Amino acid sequence: MRWIFYPAAIALAGYLAACGGGGTTITPPPPAGNFSNASLNGQYVFSMSGVDLNSGAYIARVGSFAADGQGHITAGLEDVLDLGSGSPASQLTFSNGTYQIQANGRGLIVLNVSSGGTLQLSTSLESSSQGYLVQSDGLASTSGSVELQKPLQFSANAINGKYVFDFSGISFAGSTPSVISLVGEFGADGNGNVTGGTADVNDSAFAPTGATALTASTYQLDTNGNGTNFGRGTMTLDGRTFAFYIVDNTRVELLEEDSLGGSSGPAILQTGVIPTQNSGFSGSFAFLTGGSQTTGNFGPIARVGRFTADGAGGIGTISFFENNDGNTTQVTPGSGISSTSYAIDTNSAGSGRGTFTFRNSSVGTVTYVFYLSSPTRAVIQDVSASVVTDGTMVSQSAASFTTAGLAGNYSFSWSGVELVAPSSFDENYVGQYAQTSAATSNITGVADYAQLGLNTINTNGVTLNAGISGTLTIAGDGTQNNTYKIVIGGPSAFTVNFVAYLGDGGTVLVVCSDGNRTTAGVATPQTQ
């Protein structure tokens, strides 16, 4: 997941300041695990977005590369959109490249551009089929994901069924560039036709649209060889033109390429029984969103929380944490929460669309739209006043969590903005850690991170192989407001404090609780 933080994506112009902290040196633990170069073997889609170093403008890339399992990249292709270049999206081919995957799943991928230059990516693999990425060549601050493709499904008929999508980026629809989030569901017939659907658009230049019907449109794979070789094609959706790369029949990664702006994100096949009325939706869920304020200083904002739906339109046991441009607010169950409800959209039955809302005197009225990709997962969009954010929602079926139950190896990805005068800058982290069952000092690992402004104090603003240590502290039954303290080594060691919410499958959703940054992200268990 990658969010668009307004000052970083539209008007970043400043310098990199020191992160603070002392001179603590953290020795990275020796790489341990079952990963190797053989873990990256096959064709992979990568999807990333963030900020261009030179212009401070939004940049996004989606592409595919082939890895041979022995440290070599044999071919690749990407679409890249840099709104600071003044040029439309371009296509780049990769003639070859190299990579190295350590035993802990961390690695470095270097893609050689056929026309000259390279793209360097740091990765932390969850498994041989997926992982997190951060651009680590100092040319841009982008982050995203890498996913194993199934080349036998590089055809139009692989895109067949209902797909939930979540795109974020920049819009040119208003008088000035604005942040935009698009979430929704569309149907595809496997024969090149988008049969319709429903979407919610939150463009900071306008009011949120609410549920809007999608008209029929088309999609097709490239016929010049890029379709069969890399799974590339194009799609028209909601009046916008996208390039896409097929992961498999369950997932497609898209990049907007038109005059309306630029956005990117996944489309995920709906599976399982999707509720069509309130009685079909119950249980506990944790959620995380990130994005931007749309008034005041237009600063970054990230929110994390949880709730329990009762199957009858009510929500309770609400807990919520917000970092609004470094100003933090925590809402606990029973702390003046009112006007609570949820609704499954019966006018768009079968779309997976729903809403939930609550009110608290500290944060006002908070309202979200979600689209379920399965009974336990959804994409989510914040439509509260004066914010544009989006993110993820996951079920929280466990009644309690413990450090013993969470012990294991994790990959993580955090993105956000460090808030320094006179101008803030974008930051991205990717890494791996081992968590023990101890109550304290239970995290040790390694991270690569990029903290890019227009001028940097570090070489390219990138630090590789920084040791990390810290503690995940479980609060009560662990369903809400846990703390997650990480000390990060490098040229100048620093500490980042997070509030952490836990979801099914060991998912850890975090938002920074410090006043000097608005950073959020996710950690997920490694399965190899």
Task: Walk through the language-model features, giving the residues of each.
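Mature soluble binding/inhibitory domains
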Residues: 19-528
